[in-house]
Curated annotation (Swiss-Prot):
Superkingdom of the source species: Eukaryota
Source organism per UniProt: Homo sapiens
Keyword Phosphoprotein: yes
Identification of the protein by name: LysM and putative peptidoglycan-binding domain-containing protein 2
PANTHER family: AND PUTATIVE PEPTIDOGLYCAN-BINDING DOMAIN-CONTAINING PROTEIN 2-RELATED, LYSM AND PUTATIVE PEPTIDOGLYCAN-BINDING DOMAIN-CONTAINING PROTEIN
UniProt modified residues of type Phosphoserine: 5, 24, 33, 57
Stretches for region Disordered: 1-40, 132-175, 193-215
Residue spans of biased composition, Pro residues class: 17-28
Length: 215
């Protein structure tokens, strides 16, 4: 009994051996997580969202090649926010944001609405020069000057020699005497033709009459 007491005292009150701890997972690199978040934000920025009741998509923010202008729309009795958005090709949220509307029925609290219409500038095919360059502006101005109509009363350039040589055909002047002579000639010819036709018809009827007489 005396021999077993020290062993019991060691088991009950003695210091215990430390347990082996589980290996901790390797720390995740912050650069990898940041790159994933950046890719996710870019993919969300590229996606186009559509709102209910509108065919227009949310376009890119204003920058190169995009112009935003406001069109004034007069509110009428039968207008709806959805119909106005479809008419101008914008979203209902854009109209609400531009006019500070809280609900769809708030459009009747205003007489006019500002519609934000976004239009894109057409760019050249190479993508290096836009329509707004000075060269294109001069080309547009020259093209518009060519299309200007000629105002009545302006001095026209003199006609070319070829055009001046071509003169319209003047109607032949007929005197009263010539006119009467031509009229008499036509009457004479008509009378002769009628007399000839009458003689031919008489000659055709005469054999038929003699045959009836002899019969």
């Amino acid at each position: 009994m005396a021999d077993s007491s020290p062993a019991l005292s060691l088991r009950e009150g003695g210091p215990r051996a430390p347990r082996p701890s589980a290996p901790s997972p390797p720390p995740r690199s912050r650069s990898g997580s940041e790159s994933e978040e950046a890719e996710l934000s870019l993919s969300l920025a590229r996606t186009k969202t559509r709102s209910y009741g509108s065919t227009a998509s949310v376009r890119a923010p204003l920058g190169a090649g995009v112009i935003e202008r406001h069109v004034e729309h007069r509110v009428r009795a039968g207008d709806t926010l959805q119909g106005i958005a479809l008419k101008y090709g914008v979203t209902m949220e854009q109209i609400k944001r531009a006019n500070k509307l809280f609900t769809n029925d708030c459009i009747f609290l205003k007489k006019t609405l500002n519609i934000p219409v976004i239009s894109e500038k057409p760019l050249l095919f190479n993508g290096l020069n836009s329509i707004d360059s000075p060269e294109n502006e001069t080309a547009d101005n020259s093209f518009s000057q060519e299309e200007e109509p000629v105002v009545a009363g302006e001095d026209l350039p003199p006609p070319s020699p070829q055009e001046s040589d071509v003169q319209p055909v003047q109607p032949e002047e007929v005197s009263a005497r010539d006119f009467l002579q031509r009229l008499d000639l036509q009457i004479k010819l008509s009378t002769q033709a009628a007399k000839k036709l009458k003689e031919e018809s008489r000659d055709e009827e005469s054999p038929y009459a003699t045959s009836l007489y002899h019969s």
